[in-house]
């Protein structure tokens, strides 16, 4: 059995983890819709937060991971690092799009419009556009090494935009709600039940993220192995042809 053939079969741990992710996601949604109390000011609209915040955080994490793998490719030149960078970029594209959708869902009942040029929403849209640009670059460049180098640089640029996005609500006049969970050590201003439900959904989103990226890396490595085998076979065929001619 060749490596390419053995790699085509999904590992058992990945299947089990996929089921676990689905169960945890279902429990998170149940907690958001049933367990969590309505917010004192926003009522049941707060339930959007339990999906919106986790996908936003995981979108940032995906971009950061993709950029790190891109940097490692620029340093080491290993094709598998580019595969990992692309897999995380795909997750970043998905989660960033879901972040904007969640923001628009929240905006409609509160501001009576799906879209405003709010700093936070606009910067997230810009980040999504840059990620789309990453995949456009990958589609336009055929030579694998050059494609990996250029796309790595693009993702590093996307990474540089993250601090502006994260701090937009503090730096600019924005319609985005104030943070209830602060990373600066100032604590948490949230009902304990709501916080527990939020953390459950963050864990669920993280599990889905890990499963998605792991599956995409598996498929990418399989395609990489098959491509390398095809190149080796073509090289051997050409060398055999030259020997016959000589």
Where do the PLM segments sit?
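Polytopic transmembrane helical bundles with strong interfacial aromatic enrichment
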Residues: 1-246
């Amino acid at each position: 059995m060749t490596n390419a053939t053995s790699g085509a079969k999904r590992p058992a741990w990945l299947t089990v983890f996929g089921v676990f992710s689905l169960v945890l996601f279902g429990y998170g949604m149940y907690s958001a819709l049933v367990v969590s109390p309505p917010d004192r000011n926003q009522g049941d609209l707060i339930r959007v937060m339990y999906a919106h915040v986790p996908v936003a955080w995981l979108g940032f994490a995906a971009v950061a991971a993709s950029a790190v793998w891109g940097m490692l490719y620029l340093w080491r030149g290993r094709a598998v690092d580019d595969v990992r960078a692309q897999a995380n970029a795909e997750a970043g594209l998905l989660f960033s799009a879901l972040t904007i959708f969640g923001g628009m869902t929240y905006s409609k009942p509160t501001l009576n419009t799906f879209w405003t040029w709010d700093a936070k929403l606009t910067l997230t849209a810009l980040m999504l556009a840059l990620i789309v640009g990453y995949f456009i670059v990958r589609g336009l460049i055929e030579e694998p090494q050059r494609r990996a180098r250029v796309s790595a640089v693009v993702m590093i640029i996307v990474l540089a935009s993250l601090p502006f996005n994260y701090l937009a609500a503090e730096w600019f006049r924005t319609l985005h709600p104030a943070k209830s969970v602060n990373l600066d050590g100032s604590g948490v201003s949230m009902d304990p039940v709501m916080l527990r439900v939020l953390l459950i959904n963050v864990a669920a989103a993280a599990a889905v993220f890990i499963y998605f990226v792991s599956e995409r890396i598996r498929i990418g490595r399989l395609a990489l192995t098959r491509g390398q085998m095809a190149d080796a076979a073509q090289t051997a065929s050409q060398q055999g042809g030259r020997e016959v001619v000589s």
